[in-house]
Amino acid sequence: MANHLQFNFQDATSPLMQELVKFHDHSLTILFFISALILYVLMMTSLSKLTNKNILDSQEIEMVWTVIPAFILIMLALPSIQILYLMDEIASPDITIKTVGHQWYWTYEFSDLSKESEIESYMLPTADLQNGDFRLLEVDNRISVPMDSKIRMLITSEDVLHAWTLPSMGIKVDAVPGRLNQVTFSSSLPGLFFGQCSEICGANHSFMPIAMEVIPLKTFESWIIKLSL
């Protein structure tokens, strides 16, 4: 989860987020070299006393400043397109969960199980927090998903626009009334991950957290059995 004075991403817990972090580093590396080159040229130009006012055009220079930017754009576009296709890929899921946004809480429906189950997830008030709980992030009912499994999340809203977001997994999906948006993800690491509604949805928008536990498959099966009782 996020820390105080943090300027970087949260630790990546899904293949998608790992690719996004790699692309971020790749882009910043290119931008660093471009900025360094421009700064060097500006300094050399401002400090140099050599000038030539007779040069009106140069085919060689025009070719260079056309080819090099095109090459840089290709270096940025190829990994970006790969990630876009990865985000839209819908593989055969192991489990499907329907997420519905409300003002101002979430509901999760497990409809493809032998017995349909549903949980409501509200933020815990500050007065109900225990030692070690996180203010404005803890909920009364956490959603659990199995580790190393393909999860398909169907996301919609009952009232206004919301956005279901888990930064550590690189997920941000709009919850739109009357429409189902979907996303697939998986996590290779167990743990507790937090997110929040990322679309302004009213007075209590800031009090609409998301808490997801990634647990081993056997533990998830036990959790589902208890949920169905």
Curated annotation (Swiss-Prot):
Binding annotation for Mg(2+): E199
Main subcellular location: mitochondrion
Binding site for Cu cation A2: C197, E199, C201, H205
Keywords recorded for this protein, A-Z: Copper, Electron transport, Magnesium, Membrane, Metal-binding, Mitochondrion, Mitochondrion inner membrane, Respiratory chain, Translocase, Transmembrane, Transmembrane helix, Transport
BP GO annotations: ATP synthesis coupled electron transport
Enzyme Commission number, as recorded: 7.1.1.9
Essential cofactor(s): Cu cation
Residues that coordinate or bind Cu cation A1: H162, C197, C201, M208
Catalysis performed (reactions): 4 Fe(II)-[cytochrome c] + O2 + 8 H(+)(in) = 4 Fe(III)-[cytochrome c] + 2 H2O + 4 H(+)(out)
Pfam families named among the record's database cross-references: COX2, COX2_TM
Subcellular locations according to the entry: Mitochondrion inner membrane
Cofactor binding summary note: Binds a dinuclear copper A center per subunit.
GO cellular component: a single term: mitochondrial inner membrane
Top-level class of the enzyme under EC nomenclature: translocase
Side of membrane Mitochondrial matrix, spans: 46-59
Mitochondrial intermembrane topological domain residue ranges: 1-14, 88-229
Membrane topology: Multi-pass membrane protein
Membrane-crossing segments per the record: 15-45, 60-87
Subunit field text: Component of the cytochrome c oxidase (complex IV, CIV), a multisubunit enzyme composed of 14 subunits. The complex is composed of a catalytic core of 3 subunits MT-CO1, MT-CO2 and MT-CO3, encoded in the mitochondrial DNA, and 11 supernumerary subunits COX4I, COX5A, COX5B, COX6A, COX6B, COX6C, COX7A, COX7B, COX7C, COX8 and NDUFA4, which are encoded in the nuclear genome.
Family classification: Belongs to the cytochrome c oxidase subunit 2 family.
Cited function: Component of the cytochrome c oxidase, the last enzyme in the mitochondrial electron transport chain which drives oxidative phosphorylation. The respiratory chain contains 3 multisubunit complexes succinate dehydrogenase (complex II, CII), ubiquinol-cytochrome c oxidoreductase (cytochrome b-c1 complex, complex III, CIII) and cytochrome c oxidase (complex IV, CIV), that cooperate to transfer electrons derived from NADH and succinate to molecular oxygen, creating an electrochemical gradient over the inner membrane that drives transmembrane transport and the ATP synthase.
Family annotation (NCBIfam families): CoxB
Designated name of the protein: Cytochrome c oxidase subunit 2
Organism expressing this protein natively: Myxine glutinosa (Atlantic hagfish)
